[in-house]
Amino acid sequence: MASGKEIKTKIASVQSTQKITKAMEMVATSKMRKTQDRMAASRPYSETIRNVISHVSKASIGYKHPFLMEREVKTVGMLVVSTDRGMCGGLNINLFKAVLNEIKKWKEQGVTVEVGVIGAKGIAFFRSLGFKIRAQHSGIGDNPSVEELLGIANDMFDAYKEDKIDALYLAHNQFINTMSQKPSVAQLVPLPELDTDNLDERQQVWDYLYEPEPKVLLDNLLTRYLESQVYQSVVDNLASEQAARMVAMKAATDNAGNLINDLQLVYNKARQASITNELNEIVAGAAAI
């Protein structure tokens, strides 16, 4: 059995770790709430642009943007949004599994897959598997802006415009609630047609006067919308990351507490055994006299 001093040292070490995990839990909770606010603030913007795009594209303007045109799929692009840091449970692994399943399905159909990756964890993962990474970006921090994501987003959009890829999918962790996040893999371009069945009659009137020309307006709207979708997925993934980290750190803090209790019990037993030995030695010494 370890000595009382050794056990005390272990208890102090675990208590120190417990303080760190508790602090990380509190920080993650604060960051998650701030990210949720940003996520809620950006969603109406994306939804409004999406509706306007649907209206403009259905007008008789004699123009079809490449982002709205289906074509034969020979090469697929996959833009994966991961985290820069770890200690967030199985968040990244679950996303990577979902992405690899999608890639497997495409390859079984004879389709080539190229990836673009946001986040250091994703870059390291796909590089280790030998994937060709068309574009990458890391170090986005806790408060990303649309501007800093434009580089990787435009790289993937340009690949589609230049027929280097025939479809682009966006993969990220979708924030459901504090205890639940799920991987999401959705088609980004060609843009899926908006379901207008639930719109009222006023919203389905397409006869508008456009300024500037509908073509210019549609080009700009599509670009802004796709950029907002990439931003939205990054913010969504950040909220998922902080929620997963909060849960992981809470579990670590609770486990540290249980370990401290177990070590304290061992320490008490060791101390009891030490006191018993001392008493036995005293009694034996008295008997010898």
From Swiss-Prot:
Short name of any one Pfam family annotated for the protein? ATP-synt
Could you tell me where this protein is found in the cell? Cell inner membrane
Keywords (alphabetical) are:
ATP synthesis, Cell inner membrane, Cell membrane, CF(1), Hydrogen ion transport, Ion transport, Membrane, Transport
Membrane topology label: Peripheral membrane protein
Q: What does the entry list under GO cellular component?
A: plasma membrane; proton-transporting ATP synthase complex
Gene Ontology terms, MF aspect? ATP binding; proton-transporting ATP synthase activity, rotational mechanism
The answer to whether UniProt assigns keyword RNA-binding to this entry is no
Q: Does the keyword Cell inner membrane apply?
A: yes
Classification via SUPFAM superfamilies: ATP synthase (F1-ATPase), gamma subunit (SSF52943)
Some GO term, biological process aspect, for this entry: which one? Answer: proton motive force-driven plasma membrane ATP synthesis
Stored InterPro entries: ATP_synth_F1_ATPase_gsu, ATP_synth_F1_gsu, ATP_synth_F1_gsu_CS
Chief subcellular location equals membrane
Q: Which PANTHER family match?
A: ATP SYNTHASE GAMMA CHAIN, ATP SYNTHASE SUBUNIT GAMMA, MITOCHONDRIAL
Which purpose does this protein serve, as stated in its record?
Answer: Produces ATP from ADP in the presence of a proton gradient across the membrane. The gamma chain is believed to be important in regulating ATPase activity and the flow of protons through the CF(0) complex.
The similarity annotation says: Belongs to the ATPase gamma chain family.
Name the NCBIfam families on file: ATPsyn_F1gamma, PRK05621.1-1
Assembly, in brief, is: F-type ATPases have 2 components, CF(1) - the catalytic core - and CF(0) - the membrane proton channel. CF(1) has five subunits: alpha(3), beta(3), gamma(1), delta(1), epsilon(1). CF(0) has three main subunits: a, b and c.
UniProt name for this protein: ATP synthase gamma chain
Species for this entry: Actinobacillus succinogenes (strain ATCC 55618 / DSM 22257 / CCUG 43843 / 130Z)
Q: Gene for this protein?
A: atpG
